């Protein structure tokens, strides 16, 4: 499957029915999801690998990994409603994915894998500052390789946070197209600069 084909397929994934701002539940844009997954694919980190989507939401990254030939794909989230949507999305696209209700803070409930893919919260809400840290910690605990979407300019923070535990071996700039989802949003569409980081466990 080519990059454009993957993007078109992922555009069929439904988003959150009732997103929660406190959890920063925003649907990962198909273009950005496809970019992350295809970079992982060409690096040999998807095909015939076991892949985990941490904080999978409605499943777009997990489903994309399955479409690219992962041997086994699991997605985990704490929101049962999002997981139900994820299961519907996977069925729609014929993707074999197992979705699990689990908190990233409970790594003992999450099986090890070859590759983690994730779009963790950016910590944009006051009650959610540093919300990406448990995701990074969990990823390093369960997988040797991680691909994550972070706010642009996060590389230095992530490097410092994982010092001694892992290294950033790849960085790709991207854009998160954020549609109006909540009453406090002032624009119908906002383009947020992001970066996709490849993290390898030390």
Where are these regions (language model features)?
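Class I S-adenosyl-L-methionine-dependent methyltransferase catalytic core
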Residues: 1-202
């Amino acid at each position: 499957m080519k990059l454009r084909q993957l993007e078109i397929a992922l555009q069929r994934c439904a988003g959150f029915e009732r997103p929660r701002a406190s959890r920063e539940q925003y649907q990962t844009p198909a273009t950005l999801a496809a970019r992350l997954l295809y970079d992982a694919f060409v690096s040999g980190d998807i095909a015939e690998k076991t892949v985990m989507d941490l904080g999978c939401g409605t499943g777009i990254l997990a489903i994309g990994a399955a479409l690219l030939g992962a041997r086994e794909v699991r997605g985990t989230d704490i929101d049962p409603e999002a997981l139900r949507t994820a299961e519907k999305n996977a069925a729609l696209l014929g993707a074999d994915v197992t979705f699990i209700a689990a908190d990233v803070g409970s790594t003992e409930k999450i099986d090890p894998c070859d590759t983690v893919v994730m779009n963790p919260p950016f910590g944009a809400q006051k009650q959610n500052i540093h919300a990406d840290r448990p995701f990074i910690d969990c990823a390093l605990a369960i997988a040797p390789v991680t691909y994550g979407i972070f706010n642009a300019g996060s590389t230095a923070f992530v490097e410092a946070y994982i010092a001694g535990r892992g290294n950033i071996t790849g960085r790709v700039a991207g854009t998160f197209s954020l549609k109006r989802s909540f009453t406090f949003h002032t624009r119908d569409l906002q383009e947020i600069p992001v970066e996709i980081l490849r993290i390898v466990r030390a």
